[in-house]
A protein has these predicted regions:
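LRR N-terminal entry segment and analogous cap-like coil->beta motifs
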Residues: 5-10, 14, 18-124
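N-terminal low-complexity, Pro/Thr/Ser-rich intrinsically disordered segments
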Residues: 1-2
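Leucine-rich solenoid repeat scaffolds
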Residues: 114-142
Length: 142
């Protein structure tokens, strides 16, 4: 079982694997999940009213328990940090891409991504995290 220390870094990996240019996993939909449970309201409003600064529980549960094989992780060559990433929409539909809700706090999981070559949107990472990535030879693209 692959465990990530930093949930937000795992979300960036999921973005690449599930919603990126060449998805390797079937995209997951919060709306479809809630609709299957009988929800028929406005998802954006429901999210804003009930989970203002939180990941929706269904998304948290799904993404936390999502198994990512070593083979999938070895295929990751880039990560994208952008407030408009689909994984964030699935986690928190009303999120406007601003704020610290999805900031990566730790790179302790980088050993899980042995072929990571570049990080897009690196300016959104803390300076120390940027320095750590550079020290590992990873190209940062703002």
């Amino acid at each position: 079982v692959t465990r990530f220390v930093d949930f937000n870094l795992k979300l960036a990996v999921i973005e690449e694997l599930m919603y990126g240019e060449s998805p390797k996993l079937t995209p997951w939909s919060l709306a479809d999940t809630l609709n299957a449970k009988g929800f028929d309201g406005d998802l954006w409003q429901y999210s804003a009213d009930n989970y203002w600064d939180q990941v929706m529980p269904e998304a948290q549960a799904h993404f936390e328990t999502l198994e990512l094989s070593a083979e999938l992780l070895e295929g990751i060559e880039q990560l994208i940090f952008d407030g408009g990433c689909q994984v964030y929409v699935e986690c928190c539909p009303h999120w406007d891409g601003e704020g610290e809700q999805f900031d990566v706090a730790s790179l302790d999981d980088l050993h899980l991504l042995p072929n990571l070559e570049r990080v897009l949107g690196a300016e959104l990472l803390a300076p120390q995290l940027q320095a750590d990535l550079r020290a590992r030879g990873i190209t940062l693209v703002d």
